[in-house]
């Protein structure tokens, strides 16, 4: 199967993410929390607040973690995939790829998911849709009401708790990954497209910061199949 332009673009994004995360991981051993008075850590926290594209709810949250999380989520380009597509990623007239400045992220779609990456094993098979990472207004938990422990497992192992696209062998539909192709077949228990094999090298402290930041951003209502209709109500 010849890769589609979308898959090629995703591959380029994954390579960039791998290089970026290699630099982050090399400077901070896994599990090491930021030390008090760490100038580099303090500067990242401050920069995170400066570049946050949406208002942040800091009530009941660790401010330093939120700032660091904002920094990591922004430089890792999480919104490049976890929005509703290129046409809605930026506020009209503020798209840097069109030479428009200042750059301004569209808060109405920020990390709300819904980008369609197409199929990865040929039809019939499911389209991979990026997930909504914003928090539920009912529980305050981000990324589909997942706890921090769930979030760590997702990033470390790629486990798909939602199990949106199981494997199938008998009746093949557009919602499941067939077990007879490709060879080896796609594992329906794992997230596809999402570059978790790169992100799994993030430190425990970095993952805590990212999760805390996702708790602090505004809820964005999902608009794609499988997304709860009442996330923000």
Features from the language model and the residues they span:
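Bacterial N-terminal signal peptides
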Residues: 12-23
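Surface-exposed intrinsically disordered loops and tails
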Residues: 41, 45-51, 88-123, 162-185, ...
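The canonical Cys-X-X-Cys-His
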Residues: 69, 75-85, 122, 151, ...
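Detector for the c-type heme attachment site
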Residues: 81-87, 156, 195, 215-216
């Amino acid at each position: 199967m010849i890769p589609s332009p979308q898959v090629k673009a995703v591959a380029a994004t994954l390579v960039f993410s791998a290089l970026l995360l290699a630099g982050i991981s090399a400077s901070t051993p896994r599990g090491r929390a930021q030390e008090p008075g760490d100038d580099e850590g303090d500067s990242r926290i401050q920069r995170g607040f400066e570049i946050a594209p949406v208002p942040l709810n800091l009530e009941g949250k660790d401010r330093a973690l939120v700032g660091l999380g904002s920094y990591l989520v922004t430089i890792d380009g999480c919104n490049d995939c976890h929005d509703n597509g290129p046409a809605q990623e930026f506020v009209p007239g503020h798209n840097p790829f069109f030479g428009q400045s200042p750059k301004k992220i569209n808060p109405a779609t920020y990390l709300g998911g819904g980008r369609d990456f197409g199929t990865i094993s040929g039809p019939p098979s499911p389209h991979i849709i990026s997930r909504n990472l914003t928090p539920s207004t009912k529980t305050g938990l981000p990324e589909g009401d997942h706890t921090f422990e769930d979030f760590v497992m997702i990033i470390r192992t790629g486990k798909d708790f939602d199990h949106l696209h199981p494997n199938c062998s008998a009746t093949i539909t557009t919602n499941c990954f067939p077990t007879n192709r490709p060879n080896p077949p796609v594992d329906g228990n794992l997230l596809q497209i999402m570059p978790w094999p790169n992100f799994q090298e993030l430190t425990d402290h970095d993952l805590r910061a990212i999760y805390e930041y996702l708790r602090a951003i505004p809820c964005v209502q999902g608009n794609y199949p499988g997304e709860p209709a009442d996330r923000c109500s």
